Amino acid sequence: MKKVSELEYTRLPIEDFGKEATAIIEQVKNAASAQEVLAARDKCNDLIIRWETAEALSYMRYSINTADAFYLAEKEYYDEVGPQAQNYLLEYTKAMLATPFRKELEEQGEIIPLVFRSFEVELKAMSPEIIEDMIAENQVVSQYSQMMAGMEFEFRGEKLPRPMLMKYAKSPDRAIRKEAYEVLGKTLKAHSEQLDGLFDQLVHIRDRMAKKMGYRNFVELGYYRMGRLCYGPEEVKQFRENVRRDIVPVVARLRKEIGEKLGVEPLMLYDYDLIFPQGDPAPKGGKEEIFAAARAMYHDMSEETGKFIDFMLETEAFDVDSRKNKWGGGYCTHFPAYHQPFILANFNGTAGDVDVVTHEAGHAFADYKTAKNPFVVELGVGGMETAETHSMSMEFFAWPYMDKFFGEDAGRYEFMHLLDALSFLPYGTIVDDFQRQVYENPDWTPEERKAAWRKLEAEFRPHITFDGIPYLEEGTRWQYQMHIYETPFYYIDYCLAQTAALQFLLESRKDYADAFARYVRFLSQGGEKVFTDLLEEADLRSPFQAGALQAVAQESEALLRQLEAKLDQL
């Protein structure tokens, strides 16, 4: 069994990709039977697997050290030729949609209708005339990513990457928290010209692409690019209303109480990361202890999760140390040719480190479990909202094992985790609606964008005050929310998934084994059913129905009160 560091990387030249793809497209067009179409599909899937593996390996090695000249060049290569590869696949998609054998393939179950539906959405997301714009977009995104990865924050004599600075945002000492946010704001302000300029470029590039493709603005194209098969802007509008009506008042009430316990009035942005006056629970140990606890947890959870964690640890499929020039976020990717998931994170000694072995491992488990699904190349593990349900739900299924990570602080962790999960819904809704407004108004100035952010904060998080925090008080919190620059419209997915994950938590409190079995069934199907159908099958409520979050809000608040009462007895 090879370790991830030993996996061989070979560039797949675009010329070779193009030759193979062209031959496959011709084979589909000239097919005399359904079987010939299937043979071409097999070849195309093999080509896609090789391409995605090479691209993912090069990106992973770039992200663990963004200053590595070789992998930086490889990443830039894929940024440049990726749109050309997409264009070849677009021609393949057109050929597949046009084949006279489509009905026969669907009826025989050789290719499920959802594959063809996903092809139709892909057609709406891509066109040869926007290739140059896609290359330009990739280049600007790379500039932003590198700037953020290399940005250092000078705090008390140390130069820290942002993940390490944010550790101080959870300090029980308010002066330290305030200072950390001041350093964050001042450092971002020093880069404000680039932050505004890069985003402005991205907005205009994306708007130009949308208009070239005949869309009114980038909102429509953005949804197609996300491959959404069961909801659009109207459904998200209803979801936003559900959050405003049922979640915002509960979160505001709970957070006000937390502020009172912390003895702070008003509740400032730099108070928001702290829940307990004595300091929030942190794992009882470093990296080794966390991984030992994770192994024990997954072995107890089920035989399958036990095999999964052994595989991940034996292949050294984690890179979790925070260091300079390492990409600042966390992600799970996979290398399909090797059926190998991989997790990158930046441990900083907070509870977030444990979330890596629950949340990101939830993604990895889905990759591991669906690796051999018959339609995994076309449909993956599902839409992003489905994928995030896998990860966010795993965080909650890990609750019975939190004593392995937090010892006697397990109860405090559960309270904090649930409060954070609920509090996230208004924030994620802001991130999504901000993007909608920005792309509907592409000619807004940087000041108008910042004003829109401030207005959304006042609407969805009225309990937080930004006043007096350098730069961030201007409405710039979004400038280090990297999704907004890098992957537009990939954020509401987290919110939709959170509503499903909260329901899995509430169900697991009634019958853990039954809820976990429903979760594994949900996860195992990958993308072979759309999100709303998977929810229905798991007996969970769709977040798009009017009033869908009322019960989630009430039951989650009741559970928080119950957890709080237990903590008060300690």
Which stretches of residues belong to each language-model region?
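Short beta-alpha connecting loops at secondary-structure transitions
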Residues: 342-346, 373-384, 410-420, 438-439, ...
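C-terminal, non-catalytic "cap/extension" segments appended to globular domains
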Residues: 118, 230, 321, 357, ...
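Catalytic Zn2+-binding segment of zinc metalloproteases
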Residues: 362-376, 397
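Short pre-active-site segment immediately N-terminal to the catalytic Zn-binding motif
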Residues: 282-287, 338-358
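Gly/Pro-rich turn-and-neighbor structural signature
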Residues: 266-330
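Post-HExxH zinc-binding segment in Zn-dependent metallohydrolases
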Residues: 245-246, 370, 381-409, 417-419, ...
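Active-site scaffold of zinc-dependent metalloenzymes
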Residues: 323-350, 367-368
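A well-structured
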Residues: 1-281, 293, 568-569
